[in-house]
């Protein structure tokens, strides 16, 4: 099929396509609904949850947490992980072999020139981290 485009229209379409491609991940990131701001969140928690920040490794209070029970979203209180799913990945971040069913929604994160899976609380939409294939071999 042949299109009869003048030079100006072609350049406009090319520009729209080019810039839309680079802006698309940022638009999608802003489209995630984030709600129920817990007034007791720390500055660090807000940066991670609402700006997709990352805490420094080996700084989380949850890294050495050993109590039985559940890990909850600090923003809305939704249950996210069972303590039985926690393992030491050696990365310096709390790691889990699996989340509770329906606890998260995921999206692809292309920041820093990498393709990663980012996960957000299914209830309030805040960012909680990334999914990596670093779990114990028996969990797949």
Question: Where on the chain are the PLM-derived regions?
Answer:
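Short linker/helix segments within small regulatory modules
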Residues: 110, 134-139
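Mid-length scaffold segments of soluble, non-membrane domains
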Residues: 66-95
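C-terminal segment of N-terminal export signals and the immediately downstream linker at the start
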Residues: 24-51, 55-56
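Short Cys/His-rich local motifs and their 1-3 flanking residues in nucleic-acid-associated proteins
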Residues: 78, 123-126
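Short metal-coordination and nucleic-acid-contact micro-motifs, chiefly zinc-binding Cys/His arrays
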Residues: 69, 114-117, 140
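N-terminal secretory signal peptides and thylakoid transit peptides that target proteins
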Residues: 1-18
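Short cysteine-rich clusters marking metal-coordination/redox-active sites
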Residues: 73, 121-124
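Short Fe-S-cluster ligation motifs
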Residues: 102-119
